[in-house]
UniProtKB/Swiss-Prot annotation:
Pfam families: Ribosomal_L11, Ribosomal_L11_N. One or more lysine residues are methylated. GO terms for biological process: translation. The keyword Lipoprotein does not apply. GO terms for cellular component: cytosolic large ribosomal subunit. The keyword rRNA-binding applies. The gene is rplK. This is Large ribosomal subunit protein uL11. Forms part of the ribosomal stalk which helps the ribosome interact with GTP-bound translation factors. PROSITE patterns: RIBOSOMAL_L11. CDD domains: Ribosomal_L11 (cd00349). It comes from the Bacteria. One of its GO terms (molecular function) is large ribosomal subunit rRNA binding. Keywords: Methylation, Ribonucleoprotein, Ribosomal protein, RNA-binding, rRNA-binding.
């Protein structure tokens, strides 16, 4: 009788790494995977996103093997790049740090559609606008606050 060892998931980790530049380090060591093999595969799959922040979900198994899923770059990073700023406002209610066009925001919304919980680009655009508002950014021609149907 042949016994086959069943793989068990030991950990699921969510990390943000730089595309094409992952290196073995403490963040990966804690996941418990073959770091050299992971960095080789990750860098190969993200070479077209060189220098961008790439969220990754790593599923580690008891035999040190792994699976990983790449996500799209975080909205905050995309907004900062579009507005050409280093960071958001310390107090976004009173301080505005920049402005981007509706076209740039729509481009971000279309890029992020796969990872957002939105049915269409208009809903995704409102989510992007909400994030921008929390960072102290304005999107020309877009109001992040929409009227709710409740209590109207």
């Amino acid at each position: 009788m042949l016994l086959v060892a069943k793989k068990e998931i030991t950990r699921i980790a969510k990390l943000e790494l730089i595309g094409g530049q992952a290196k073995p380090g403490p963040a990966l060591a804690s996941v418990g995977i073959n770091m050299g093999e992971f960095t080789k595969q990750f860098n190969e799959k993200t070479k077209d996103r060189m220098g961008d922040v790439v969220p990754v979900i790593i599923t580690a198994f008891n035999d040190k093997s792994f699976l990983f899923e790449l996500k799209t770059t975080p909205v905050t990073v995309l907004l900062k790049k579009a507005a050409k700023i280093e960071s958001g406002a310390k107090n976004p209610k009173t301080e505005k740090v920049g402005k981007i066009s509706k076209a740039e925001a729509l481009k971000i919304a279309e890029y992020k559609m796969a990872d957002l919980n939105a049915y269409d680009t208009e809903a995704a655009l409102r989510m992007i606008a909400g994030t921008a508002k929390q960072m102290g950014l304005e999107i020309e021609g877009v109001d992040p606050v929409t009227k709710s149907k409740k209590g109207s």
